[in-house]
Amino acid sequence: MIYEDKFIRVEREENELPWVKIFTAKPYRELSKCDEASRARLYEAMLVAEKAMLEFYKPTKINIASFGNYVPHVHIHVIARFENDAFFPDSVWASTKRKSELRLPKFDE
């Protein structure tokens, strides 16, 4: 766990890519069911994570995703992507295209 407050929690996804998941504190199944304060905090945290990754890692692109098919709890994935990552330009859930050659600064929680 990286961060938690009464509206959200932020977790690091175990992956070679810089990747965080931001969950609502309450187990809402759909974004439209979230209370306004939780939804606002979720988006605020998403933007903070995106800006921090852009500044720290200098990625080619930031991917932002929300599915919830396997984990039916509102959450957003924020993932820094690089031209030389194993999946680029495809989704991180696709098959790998190459061996990754990432050399990234170390991130400590």
Task: Give the residues covered by each predicted segment.
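HIT superfamily nucleotide-processing domains
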Residues: 1-109
